[in-house]
Amino acid sequence: MTAEPTRLWPEEIRLSKGKESLFVKFDNGYETTLSAELLRVESPSAEVQGHGVGQKTTPAGKAKVTISALEPVGNYAIRISFSDGHDTGLFSWNILYDYGQRQQQLLVDYLERLAAAGGSRH
């Protein structure tokens, strides 16, 4: 995990026109665009991450998933609902920042897990 500022606050959160990505600009000037697919397969929900070590799942067939809704959760996160019905992940500002910093490696890791499981993005 990369070093994070003590306090993160999004100045702007914008859903792309086709709902296939989420743009976030933080108050420290950092900007990132995260694909709906990456957010879905790395959802911080227990459904995806599991309840303990070694329980993480590898959702297949998410290449065309889109974001159907964004809902603020207090002043620290958003709940993202996806076109496949998944809506249990709370994405804190720290998680969104971290995913932005590590998105290339997260995608590589996901594709490796998917291949090992015999799954497909489509």
What kind of feature is each model-predicted range?
Residues M1-H122:
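Motif-centric detector for short Cys/His coordination patterns
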